[in-house]
Amino acid sequence: MKRKMKLSLIENSVSRKTTFTKRKKGMTKKLTELVTLCGVEACAVVYSPFNSIPEAWPSREGVEDVVSKFMELSVLDRTKKMVDQETFISQRIAKEKEQLQKLRDENHNSQIRELMFGCLKGETNVYNLDGRDLQDLSLYIDKYLNGLTRRIEILIENGESSSSLPLPIVANAAAPVGFDGPMFQYHNQNQQKPVQFQYQALYDFYDQIPKKIHGFNMNMNKDSNQSMVLDLNQNLNDGEDEGIPCMDNNNYHPEIDCLATVTTAPTDVCAPNITNDL
C-alpha cells in the first residue's frame, strides 16, 4: 500500500534529487495534456540546484512567445487571476469559512422550524426560551407567513382560489344515500360557515303511509279521514322531535321550506285496497 508523503523539505539530498526528477517529469506531462486537451498556451521555466542552466518547456522559443503575449495584456488583465501561494491559501480558507457558515445557517433554520411546529403542537413551552430564540422564532414565523401569502397570490393569479376546494363533509353513522325530498336548512349557533351534510332517506317512513291508510279504512266510519290526518301529523311531529344526530352531538332540527298539504274529502279518498263504506 502506497503511504502518503509528508509535505515538507526532504532532508536527504539523494532522495530529494530523485523526487525532483520524478515530479518534474510529471509536471511536464500534465502541461502537455493541458495544452492538448484544453487548447491553451502554457510554458514552464524550472530553476534547480541540480542544473546550472534553467530548463524551459516546451522550448526556449515557446516560452518567449507565451511570455511576450502575456506582457501585451493590460495590468488589470494580467493581475486579475494572478495569485501567489499565500493568496491562494487565504482564498481557500475564506471559501471554507463561507461554506461552514452556510451549513450553520441551515442547521439553525431547521432547529427554528422544529421549534415552531413544536409550539403549534403544544410540545414546546415558549416560556422556556431565551430572548434570542424568541426573536429568531418571530422572524422565522414572519418569513413563513410571507411565503404562504406569496403562494396564495400566485394561485389567485393562475385562476385558482380556495372556493374550488371541496367543502368538508360531516359523516353520518350510517352509509349515506340519496334524498329527493324537500330542502332542509339546519342552524347551529356555533356554526359560522356552511357545512355540507349527508342525509338519510325517509323512504321507510313513507312506505308505511299506505299501510297505515289501509289499516284505517278497515274500520272506517264518518270520522275516518280525520283520524288518518291526525295520525300522519303525529308521525311527522315524532320525526321532528328526534332530530338528526351529527358529529358534534347536536341535534339539528330542520326548518322546512315547503311541506305538502294533505287535503281529504269524505268521498274522495284514494288508496290501495281501500273499501269505502260511506
Curated annotation (Swiss-Prot):
Q: In which tissues is it expressed?
A: Male gametophyte, embryo and endosperm.
Domain of life, per UniProt, equals Eukaryota
GO CC entries: nucleus
Could you tell me which PANTHER family the record lists for this protein?
A: SERUM RESPONSE FACTOR HOMOLOG
How it assembles, according to the record, is: Interacts with AGL61/DIANA and AGL62.
Q: Which species is this UniProt entry from?
A: Arabidopsis thaliana (Mouse-ear cress)
UniProt-recorded name of the protein = MADS-box transcription factor PHERES 2
Specify the inducers: Repressed by MEA in seeds, and by PKL after germination.
UniProt keywords (A-Z) are:
DNA-binding, Nucleus, Transcription, Transcription regulation
The Gene Ontology biological process annotation of the record reads: positive regulation of transcription by RNA polymerase II
| Major subcellular site | nucleus
Work out whether the entry's keyword set contains RNA-binding.
Answer: no
| A GO MF label | cis-regulatory region sequence-specific DNA binding
Q: Where in the cell is it found?
A: Nucleus
Q: What else is known?
A: The PHE2 locus is imprinted in gametophytes. Maternal inherited gene is repressed in female gametophyte, while the paternal inherited gene is expressed in the male gametophyte (pollen tube) and in fertilized seeds. The maternal repression is dependent on MEA, which may modulate the methylation of the maternal locus, and repress its transcription.
